[in-house]
């Protein structure tokens, strides 16, 4: 006979921060009777999900990858942004074997060094300082043909903020005496993670064939033309920028292609289009034989050189539950599925023993303000059924709405997104109460609580560094102040009566009352 389990659920409300200022604060203005009631009835606090508390530079906004790694590992994990910036500062970057080999091999056959990545100071998927270091390294080692394919942000940065960065790189190449910004395209196309291959194909064709919707004389001209077309950075259509002789840079056999994004989830699809022999996402007109370098490991089954391999995280929450013969469920929509699985497990693709996964398809809409509830009802249907089954000791669930709709900059839609999640939380808590379960309700970082940039008046589409909520719906308890995301796994294990592995340096911040 199967033992009925009383699950402990962790509900992660993605992009749901706390902000004192109520202006254009979608979290504040949303009608959220369920969460209001839970806050009034149960222990709650605010915890940190940004900066040094999650292994990022001081003041750097958190993000979903970082948040889930810190939650799942139960320790502060120093992030790739910090790690690579330090390597550049120390000079180690200039001797990195994967990078130097790709450059040198291209030079040896008179090939080109192509560099692609999100040209942004956002620090979420990449940093333009890293891209500059890569351009300088290629020229320093003797490359005569250096081509930068710039993916534009406007999501982790203000919607129209790419121009200064593009101007800087044009001046950089002039000062270096070689190299050019060869193409620009919005991240909406180049960095899709939801199998919308029609978008990715536009970036692939731009880089391999020089095929584009637009052509401009300079990168600055390209962004100005995009703004004239009313395209924000994220949505800039494919634009090729010929050199002074009118030549268009195309990726060909024996060239190097170095991808300077350090975050995996939005780097995987376009990487596979370049390196997978059996790729079938779209029809590729050309498949050049190139030396491809991933800045970090985007997936274990992608066959390409890695400049900075992942460090192994052991005794994460998922692994600990496995080792103690406890069952666990991970559930989310497509947009955040990798976060509750791959990232939560410390960068491991394969499920642990006793770990089940449920993926709910995110709606196929151009932007999520068109459907702010996303697939939350279907997600909650599956989650409630899993709770009622009493099969799981631990359930990890992510509701993407606050983040995905927050990124659109649409305040009214973000309010609706928060309201949809609140309704779902009510159903989940009711199901848990019926089976004697408990839950922690928290977030991974802020977003929807700030929908306008107060300094510019533009829509605010980026994450924030605000504190995030934590509610314990369970026994009589107190929550200590000063908590961080890395405290959640030790707290969960303690609530379950389990010992905390020594690798988890977070602390249990919920103290049960006698």
Curated annotation (Swiss-Prot):
Binding site for Mn(2+) 1: 403, 407, 463
SUPFAM superfamilies: 2,3-Bisphosphoglycerate-independent phosphoglycerate mutase, substrate-binding domain, Alkaline phosphatase-like
Metabolic or biological pathway, per its Swiss-Prot or TrEMBL entry: Carbohydrate degradation; glycolysis; pyruvate from D-glyceraldehyde 3-phosphate: step 3/5
GO molecular function: manganese ion binding; phosphoglycerate mutase activity
Keywords attached to this entry: Glycolysis, Isomerase, Manganese, Metal-binding
Catalytic reaction equation(s): (2R)-2-phosphoglycerate = (2R)-3-phosphoglycerate
GO biological process: glucose catabolic process; glycolytic process
Superkingdom per UniProt: Bacteria
Stated name of the protein: 2,3-bisphosphoglycerate-independent phosphoglycerate mutase
Upper classification of the organism: Bacteria, Pseudomonadati, Pseudomonadota, Gammaproteobacteria, Alteromonadales
